[in-house]
Amino acid sequence: MRLLRHSRALVATLAAALVLGGCAAPRQPSAGNTDARIRLLAQAHIAAGTEVLGTPWGGISGIDYDPQSGQFWLISDDRSAHAPARIYTARWSPAQQPTQPPHITGVFTLLTEQGQPFPSPRQRTGSNAEVPDAEAIRWHAGRQRLWWTSEGDWARGGIPRLREALPTGQWARDIPLPPAFTPTLQPQRTGPRPNASLEGLAFS
């Protein structure tokens, strides 16, 4: 996925997060209120390539909101091409400051099980050097951990992953996926397709 396209998509992503995640405790619907339409509450735009806390902004593919802390979590899927795979934290209060863009409060490098940043395709060496294609991110309030997905590096044999990380980006564990998420090419092609596997993630 291209850097610019995802930065433009930030408008829709943030708007959806406000609607679905909620910035305040949801009100109980009154009797007879069945209007379940999604409404645009606010929008913001941060241009691709803008330097944010020492990193180039862009490739934002996932976002989640923690109503207890009032903090947003965002993840970049630029495959470590412009900076190591990373997550951002942000604050945004469009109801109080409708003209103000989100305030990016932190950036954290996602780390491998060995405690190293994920390499870019150019930096990758060896069969075990995974290049992630991060897509979704969710805050697990009960565990105080982040869950994030990677579609894998198909051209180099990488497979989809579901991972748990500490809020500062350190690896916590890989969460096993069903065998159907492991692609095979021989004797016939089975499993997910490139750029079409773990796009989203939700708790239920």
Regions found by a protein language model. Give the residues of each.
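Bacterial N-terminal signal peptides that target proteins for export
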Residues: 2-11
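Bacterial N-terminal signal peptides
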Residues: 11-21
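Sequence/structural signature of beta-propeller domains
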Residues: 23-204
